[in-house]
Amino acid sequence: MERVTLRIPEQQIDEVEQMVERGKFPNRSEAIRSAVREMIDEHTDKTGAKSWAKV
């Protein structure tokens, strides 16, 4: 797995931390990976083509 560095507003990090504390995710990294997977799924049409990127 590749490491990616990004900047996220403090308020969003606080919200992610709250989800981790409530047990929805085991850690922040998994919460963010889940959000990325959800975004990819949301933007992939039924043929598998990504609507947001040229493939």
UniProtKB/Swiss-Prot annotation:
- GO annotations under biological process? cell division; regulation of DNA-templated transcription
Write out the GO cellular component annotations.
Answer: cytoplasm
Please give the superkingdom of this protein's source: Archaea
For whether the record's keyword set contains Acetylation, the answer is no
- The record's principal subcellular location, in a coarse class, is cytoplasm
Disruption phenotype annotation: Deletion of the gene does not affect the growth rate but causes drastic increase in cell size together with morphology defects. Division is strongly impaired. However, a small subset of mutants are still able to divide. The deletion mutant is insensitive to the cell cycle inhibitor aphidicolin.
| Compartment(s) | Cytoplasm
Q: Name one Pfam family in it.
A: RHH_1
Q: What is this protein called?
A: Transcriptional regulator CdrS
Q: Name one GO molecular function term.
A: DNA binding
Expression induction: Part of the cdrS-ftsZ2 operon. Transcriptionally regulated by CdrL.
Family as reported in the entry's similarity comment: Belongs to the CdrS family.
Q: Which UniProt keywords apply?
A: Activator, Cell cycle, Cell division, Cytoplasm, DNA-binding, Transcription, Transcription regulation
Provide the function of this protein: Transcriptional regulator which plays a central role in the regulation of cell division. Activates the expression of the gene encoding the cell division protein FtsZ2, and of other genes encoding proteins predicted to function in critical aspects of cell division. Required for normal cell division but not for cell elongation. May act during the transition from stasis to growth. The CdrSL-FtsZ2 transcriptional network might coordinate cell division timing with cell growth.
Give the InterPro entries listed for this entry. Arc_rbn_hlx_hlx, CopG, Ribbon_hlx_hlx
